[in-house]
C-alpha cells in the first residue's frame, strides 16, 4: 500500500536517532494508531491519505541527486516505480518526472517572465527537505484540527481561570536532528495553545 520497506535504515529522516526501544512493539503501536483513528471518526480515505503522505515524507529522504555537466546542475538518474522518487510520487499520487524536474529545475518568476533555473545538488536536496517538512507540517496540523473537531464539545461554556504552563525545550541546535526539532515545535505549539485557551 505505502510502498515502504521493513528496514528503518532505508529512511534517513526517521533513522538518525535511536530506532529500537525494547519495550515498544511497532506493530502493536500501529494497531493502536488505527484504533485511535477509528475512535476519532476518521474515514477510510482520511486514514489512507495520512498513511500515504507519511510514507511520502519519509521516502523524500532517499531522493539523491548527481551533478550533471559543467554547470554543477543536479539531476536524478533513477526515477522508476521502485526508486525513492517513484515511491514519493506514488505516495503523493503525482507523476515522478515533473516532481523531480521541480526539484532540479524549478520555474521562477523574473520580472514578468517565468524562467527555468538549474539547481545544484545541495539546492535540490534542500528543496526536497523543505517540501517534506511542509507536507509533515500540514499533515500534523490537519490531524490536530481533526482531533479537535471530534473532541471539542461546542455546548460547553467557557470558564475563566488562570493557568501557567512551561514545557522544557532542548535547544542544542548543533546536535539536534529533525526529530528533536519536531518535538520542540510541538512543545511550543502546545504551550501557545494552552496559554491562549487556558
Please state what every model-predicted region is.
Residues 1-198:
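N-terminal switch/interaction subdomains of large nucleotide-dependent motors and GTPases
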Amino acid at each position: 500500500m505505502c510502498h515502504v520497506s521493513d528496514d528503518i535504515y532505508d529512511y534517513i529522516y526517521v533513522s538518525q536517532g535511536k530506532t529500537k526501544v525494547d519495550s515498544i512493539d511497532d506493530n502493536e503501536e500501529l494497531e493502536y494508531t488505527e484504533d485511535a483513528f477509528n475512535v476519532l471518526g476518521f474515514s477510510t480515505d482520511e486514514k489512507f491519505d495520512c498513511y500515504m503522505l507519511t510514507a511520502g515524507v519519509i521516502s523524500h529522504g532517499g531522493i539523491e541527486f548527481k551533478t550533471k555537466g559543467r554547470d554543477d546542475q543536479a539531476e536524478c538518474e533513477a526515477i522508476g516505480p521502485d526508486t525513492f522518487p517513484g515511491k514519493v510520487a506514488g505516495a503523493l499520487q503525482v507523476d515522478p518526472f515533473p516532481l523531480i524536474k521541480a526539484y532540479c529545475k524549478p520555474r521562477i518568476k523574473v520580472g514578468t517572465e517565468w524562467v527555468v533555473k538549474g539547481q545544484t545538488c545541495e539546492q535540490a536536496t534542500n528543496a526536497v527537505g523543505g517540501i517534506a517538512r511542509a507536507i509533515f507540517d500540514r499533515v500534523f496540523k490537519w490531524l490536530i484540527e481533526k482531533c479537535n473537531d471530534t473532541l471539542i464539545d461546542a455546548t460547553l461554556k467557557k470558564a475563566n481561570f488562570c493557568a501557567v504552563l512551561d514545557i522544557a525545550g532542548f535547544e542544542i541546535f548543533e546536535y539536534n536532528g529533525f526529530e528533536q526539532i519536531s518535538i520542540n515545535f510541538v512543545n511550543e505549539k502546545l504551550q501557545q495553545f494552552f496559554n491562549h485557551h487556558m
